[in-house]
Amino acid sequence: MPYSPLLIKPFRDELVDAGVKELLTPDDVDALMKKEGTTLVVVNSVCGCAAGMARPGVNQALKNDKKPDNVASVFAGQDLEATARFRSHIPDIPPSSPSLALFKDGELVFFVPKHRIEGRDANGLAADLVGMFDEFC
């Protein structure tokens, strides 16, 4: 069952305010995945590591000169169909939220699962993302 929209609005807004496009439907996901160039998809979540590390780390990394052509998010536990459709694009990767996936021309080139977000700080995660942006974007 999805979370209350009132509960998660601040969690959505934290990314949207940084320019991240929300993918609310399977069609939104499919349209994004057809785009050429580099794409970062954030699997957003209500958990503490999303609040303390993932969202702040993404926001910090997006200030880098080099960044993906497209940046979007799905919200696990809320936008169930969109999240399932996104996960169908990475079938060999177990579901993980929060998580981050970087694609280049539709091919997954970098993935950060929850266990590589937990226990870190936002600066460390941002540094990892900036390294990937510098390499692939």
Model-derived regions, located:
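Non-catalytic, surface beta->alpha helical segment in thiol-disulfide oxidoreductase systems
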Residues: 94-137
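Conserved strand-to-helix beginnings and helix N-cap segments that scaffold or border functional pockets
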Residues: 51-56, 83-84, 122-123
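Structural signal for conserved beta-strand scaffold positions within catalytic alpha/beta enzyme cores
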Residues: 24, 73-75, 102
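Thiol-based oxidoreductase modules, predominantly thioredoxin-like and allied folds used
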Residues: 43, 66-85
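Short helix-loop-beta junction
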Residues: 7, 11-14, 59-68
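Local sequence-structure signature of Cys/Sec-based thiol-disulfide redox active-site neighborhoods
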Residues: 31-65
